[in-house]
């Protein structure tokens, strides 16, 4: 099996990834440890012209015209080694420059401070090789000709003058100085070996993907591409105290660590490929669980980055994320019941649910609250505008309820639908494991949560579910796709589901070019390119699709799915999100949870896709 694309400029290995620009390697990342910006920039009098551009399983090949000279450019990555080649039929007298710096989270970060905290240092090995060190990681860069190397306190700059006709630049990262130096020495002598190893690795992975029964070539191309994304986002981080098992990064080009709800979605997709990989995806999350029961929002590769971003001396922040993990556990165990995994998941989910009851339910009504917009997963959503404003108006009042709150506590409709599913799942696991008392307890708790959602969150006038403030149960009248999780969780009544379907297919609300914008299109704050303020995300499509199926709206589910699949198949693309008014892919490339479309395609296949 092969995948051939035109115009794709991103390529990744294990925790190493790179992105081509118009004139060389625009960005290179080694996890959350190092970045090259640029890594290899061709200096030319005029901007290079890209004449031909082909991406396949072996790497990326381009033909460039630079200062009247035609160059063949090739880049490949295998594991944590990258090779970059430039071939010229004649002397070109071109120069190339690059630099390596410690990784930062925001362009506003102080690189000098980060370098000091992570003990960054550079070292010249010889006239063609240098090494950098940061947070117990090494990264070596080597060329097949002499280069100028300038070691500074927080970066290493390098340049190659009068590049040879067969120019080779390689780099490799790892935990051993000797190993990375051996790797670059080997790769610079035989760079095409890296391309061969990469192609062999990817062909092996893709040979095991399930087949898709459809006559649509563009659908098959999307199917293969999304499998490429979910399988190559898998990562192994050596010598990490929490990331002890392989896991999927959401994307290796932006979000290079593990997130809670992302990994739950990844596990759901991986269960279609290999149930053991799906279980493995959740192990680090279980391992990261804190003594009080909280499963953290995210697990950083770099403690320095987490400390600077969250002001905690840890690899994890103090927040959680939407509890989709029980949904993933149920999907895995429905595929294959593993008693050992079921017992582990049961114990972890019970502790996690107890944490929600103790730490996110101050009014003890069996509805939990978000107290930080980032732990909602909907970062800058219109949903949180008023709650953030309320906290600013009454900080003392809200901080008495929750000292770390960054918005007025919100009993969110999606959070509590997921908690309902989690409590039902715990009840089912307890019964399967013979703990009937706990099973009855969590069944009753789930029922209380369901009743309160129906009592407080449904609005008769607008026929829609809304978030409510925890202290007053006043509705926050912002329509979002979170309401459709009441159908996913089977909480909505038949009559309510009918009304929700009307909202879904209203072009003024959620039936936009790319369906399900993160706020209804009739909201004054709707922005079709706004991150969580109007873009469309595939996880919301997935929840809504299965909600429609749950209530027997099979034609409507198919209509939703096909509209989304058609747009994604145009590339194919598997982007972080999409402009809801045009369908244009936006956000990060090769985004993990957007492969949830595979789960939908697999279900649609039963009816002839």
Can you name each region flagged by the protein language model?
Residues 1-218, 254, 261, 273, ...:
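Terminal accessory carbohydrate-recognition/targeting modules of carbohydrate-active enzymes
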Residues 166-168, 277, 293-294, 485:
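Beta-sheet entry/capping signal
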Residues 183-197, 218-225, 274-287, 338-357, ...:
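Extended, well-ordered alpha-helical scaffold segments
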Residues 200-207, 258-259, 444, 478, ...:
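Short acidic alpha-helix initiation/capping motifs at coil-to-helix transition points
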Residues 216-257, 286-315, 365-411, 451-535, ...:
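Extended glycan-interaction surfaces of carbohydrate-active proteins
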Residues 256-388, 416, 476, 535-557, ...:
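Aromatic-rich carbohydrate-recognition surfaces in CAZymes
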